[in-house]
């Protein structure tokens, strides 16, 4: 029974990383929603924009899910780049591979109507703060840098991607 739990956990890691690397956002969203509904409490993720607690929780979750890619990516968290600090960047060890830049946002119901607007806020922050600067300086072609906006509201999650 314990081995089955670990095997199922490995399946989640593998499914998540495969969806990420193949740019299957619908699958990525489904996996995160499944994790949220089956494994998390509102105590974990918060139901309001309480300081940075929900954002930090999801940040740690995503780091945990992608850590298995260390043999293919240099995974960096909270590094300064451009005019700010991105949440997570994945620098490919082979320059011809895709890079990923992730920004996490908690839905602010006073400023945003829905999670779609929260994702757009994440994309605006990536652009305005020029978070791609460090990746480009590292020699990664900007056309290979995929930006992911993550929006959270309690157990609700939305992830979108753009180049």
Predicted feature locations:
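Extended alpha-helical interface modules used as scaffolds for assembling large macromolecular complexes
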Residues: 1-130, 157-163
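Nucleic-acid nuclease catalytic cores
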Residues: 119, 130-161
């Amino acid at each position: 029974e314990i081995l089955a739990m670990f095997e199922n956990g490995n399946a989640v890691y593998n499914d998540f990383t495969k969806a990420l690397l193949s740019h299957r956002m619908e699958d990525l969203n489904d996996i995160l929603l499944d994790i949220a509904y089956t494994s998390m409490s509102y105590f974990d993720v918060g139901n309001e924009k309480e300081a940075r607690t929900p954002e930090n929780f999801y940040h740690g979750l995503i780091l945990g899910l992608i850590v298995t890619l260390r043999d293919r990516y240099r995974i960096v968290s909270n590094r300064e780049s451009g005019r700010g600090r991105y949440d997570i960047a994945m620098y490919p060890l082979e320059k011809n591979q895709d890079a990923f830049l992730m920004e996490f946002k908690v839905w602010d119901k006073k400023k945003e109507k829905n999670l779609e607007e929260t994702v757009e806020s994440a994309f605006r922050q990536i652009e305005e703060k020029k978070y791609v600067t460090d990746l480009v300086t590292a020699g990664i072609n900007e056309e290979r840098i995929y930006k992911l906006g993550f929006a959270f509201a309690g157990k609700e999650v939305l992830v979108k991607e753009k180049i």
